[in-house]
Amino acid sequence: MDATSAPHRIPPEMPQYGEDYHIFEMMQSMLEQLLIHQPEDPISFMISHLRRNNDNVPRVVILGPPASGKTTIAMWLCKHLNSNLITKENLLEREFSLLSLEAKKHYQVYKRVPNSTLVSLVQERLNEDDCLRRGWILDGIPERREQALMIQTLGLAPKHVIVLSAPDSVLIERNVGKRIDPVTGEIYHTTFDWPPELEIQNRLIQPEGISEIDTAKKLLEYHRHIIRILPSYPKILKTISSDQPCVDVFYQALTYVQSGHRCNAPFTPKVLLCGPMGCGKKLQAALLSQKYGLVNISCGQLLKEAMAAESSLGDLIEPFFEKRMTVPDSIITRVLTERLKQQDCIQKGWVLHGFPRDLDQARLLNSMGYSPNRVFFLNVPLDSILERLTLRRTDPVTGERFHLMYKPPPTIEVQARLLQNPKDSEEYIKLQTDLFYRNSGDLEQYYDRAIIVNGDQDPYTVFEYIESGIINPLPRKVT
């Protein structure tokens, strides 16, 4: 590169390509695996790693006290994510494994498995092809801090650790009524989850060691070990209360497992705000611009600026404004392209609102090479929109704007001279809102990773939701 031609500017296509294909994350993952496994032939190792394409498979650890429901949640997660459930029981029952046979004999005599043996069983299972391809969910493993450290030393690092918690009194009550279906392995309860089928009821069995005294002993042992395990997973740990319906626990666990952790990859926000008029797009765009320095791009404002500048594009726009007609998409995209390709948008990122309004415009924006990496739909009921807009008034003398409910005029004299913008009439608002929602379904389907935000709340609460959606990685879709 010629040093005399500085300053050098990276073409905008390069970071866009890296972001689209997750180049940074891919290189980071390969480097991690190289340092963990230290292969003699790094090139062949990296090629096989790329062919495996398993960076995003679930690697989850679920911990919790007896009767917390961790096995049920783990089974549901496995079915939903098409992953492999790994428990101490199925590790001991594996066929064609000498290690499992030895561990089972030891367990039958001493009622426990040595730490090193259990970790070796875990390593053996996780290195099998189905676990490499589809990921794994460890149920109740590790049981002790020593096991957690040994697993980490082997480079078997989970991406998400879920810890279920509930009061001991609740857990004891649950455990006493626990029943197991020997055919399917499903867990039922005499009070909370009794099967309706008589056939299943008749074959249920009561597991050993679920009396109140036995459960209290197990809880005591669990509490003694869990406080030493948790510091091993400081940044990937989430505690979920299991003293709630099982479906709610599962939903929280699934949401966490599908979420990604923050990455060090370079990220330039390109935000699109969609919503009906009066939903607060302009305010949210201004707040994002103020806090993060994003370039605030209002499509309508851009068209007015182009017309005021008396440019060639402005001459094309002016007749449509004078006749109050919709500006053609071809002209709008030319104005947008001129703005989005400027250096401040490339360096700082941007927040766009007012375009696209329908599916064709969304496809047009994407074909221009300016697809957003965060899309938010602000949903507000029509009643709230009417309340926000129809009560707006302007003082023609001072230019000050009022709202008859939230910011009333100070005197009767001022109130008497207030005027309403024709665009704030109820008929016009209903027409525009109906037009937006007629096209919003196609837009939401096109931007299938968009985030839906309830815009009918305090604007700073809405901003916090949008901010969270920008800062945190988008949740992964289950295929």
Curated annotation (Swiss-Prot):
Role summary: Nucleoside monophosphate (NMP) kinase that catalyzes the reversible transfer of the terminal phosphate group between nucleoside triphosphates and monophosphates. Has highest activity toward AMP, and weaker activity toward dAMP, CMP and dCMP. Also displays broad nucleoside diphosphate kinase activity.
GO terms classed as biological process: ventricular system development
GO molecular function annotations of the record: (d)CMP kinase activity; adenylate kinase activity; AMP binding; ATP binding; nucleoside diphosphate kinase activity
InterPro entries the record matches: Adenylat/UMP-CMP_kin, ADK_active_lid_dom_sf, P-loop_NTPase
Originating organism: Rattus norvegicus (Rat)
Region (NMP 2): 298-327
Location of the region described as LID 1 in the Swiss-Prot/TrEMBL record: 177-206
GO cellular component, one term: axoneme
Region (NMP 1), start-end ranges: 87-113
Binding site for AMP 1: G140, I141, P142, E143, Q147, R203
Protein name: Adenylate kinase 8
Keyword Mitochondrion found: no
Keyword Phosphoprotein: no
Localization annotation: Cytoplasm, Cytosol; Cytoplasm, Cytoskeleton, Cilium axoneme
Keyword tags: ATP-binding, Cell projection, Cytoplasm, Cytoskeleton, Kinase, Nucleotide-binding, Transferase
Positions with a binding annotation for ATP 1: A67, S68, G69, K70, T71, T72
Record-stated family: Belongs to the adenylate kinase family.
Encoding gene per record: Ak8
Transmembrane segments: none
Organism ancestry: Eukaryota, Metazoa, Chordata, Craniata, Vertebrata
Enzyme Commission designation: 2.7.4.3, 2.7.4.6
